[in-house]
Every structure is written in structure tokens, then in C-alpha cells.
Amino acid sequence: ALVKRLIADADIVIENFRPGIMARFGLDYDSLKDSRPGLVYCSISGFGQSGPYVHRAAYAPIVHAASGFDSVHAASQGGADSRPANWEIMVADILTGTTAFGAIQTALLGRERHGVGEHIDISMMESMMTLIPAHIQGAQMEESPVIGRFHPVKVKDGFVML
């Protein structure tokens, strides 16, 4: 009841439960849109609100690996056999939040122009895939092009970027 009262005055709802959880509570977009036609509702999940991986749990390190991001990074840091980095910065979380921000701002602009809100489906996986398009294309070529001109150089006490 409290959440529904909060939503009654909200312009935006952002949720990041596994797909289907909000529907169980009657708090999904389809349950709210008739009473709140201007609502901008953003669902964030690991692999999206539909599709073959919809019920897979995800957090940043899982999505780093599933998207190929870890593999691309390992290859650039010493070869495909290198152990993927143990990221201390959860790139997927940051990038997905930034992607959601842009989508929400666009939906708010659309609402100003057309008078209706919308449901936004943001997946961590899709957000991460935006980081590696050149690597994906290169993997499909017989001879993969060199991507980027700047690489860390190994020195006696670590690496330096030139």
C-alpha cells in the first residue's frame, strides 16, 4: 500500500528485481499504466524482461563474462589465456545506470511531447555489449584488425601507458 501511494505521485519508477517479481506485487508497468498514463517505468535486469535468459540471475561480474568484456580485456592484457581481471569497479553497474538515465530522460521528453509515459527495459547485457562492437566485428574476420593504438607497456615495476 505504501509503495502504491508513493507511485501515485511519482513521475518515474525504477526497479531492478528479477523479471516477474513486480507483477506478483501488482507493481509492474501493466498494472500501473491505466491509473498513471504518464508514468515512466524503468525495469533493469541482467538479461532483459524477455528472452531465453530472462530468469537468470545476474550481477556485474556475471555480465562482464557473459558479454565478452572480460575476454576482450584479458586479450588486451596478455593474451586469451590470461586470467580475466578481478574488476574492482563494476563497469556493468555503472554503464547500465548511465544507459537507464539516458533512456529515462528520453522517455520524459516523449511524455512532454505526446502526453504518455512508457515502460523501458534496460538489460545489463545489452549495456555491456555497447563497449565491444569493434571486437565483435573483428572476431568475424579472417584476419582480425588491430584495434586501438594505445596499449600499456610492461616495465620493470609494472605497466606504463605511453
Where are these regions (language model features)?
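Generic beta-sheet signal
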Residues: 42-44, 59, 64-65, 72
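A structured beta-alpha segment of the ubiquitous adenosine-cofactor-binding alpha/beta core
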Residues: 1-34
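Short glycine-/small-residue-rich Rossmann-like dinucleotide-binding loops
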Residues: 18-19, 45-46, 67
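Helix-loop-strand module that forms the ligand-binding subsite of alpha/beta enzymes
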Residues: 30-37, 42-55
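Acidic, glycine-rich segments within the central catalytic cores of soluble metabolic enzymes
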Residues: 65-162
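Structural scaffold positions in well-ordered secondary structure
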Residues: 14, 32, 41, 60, ...
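Glycine/Thr-rich phosphate-binding loops of Rossmann-like dinucleotide-binding domains
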Residues: 23, 50-52, 72
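Short secondary-structure junction motifs
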Residues: 22, 36, 117-119
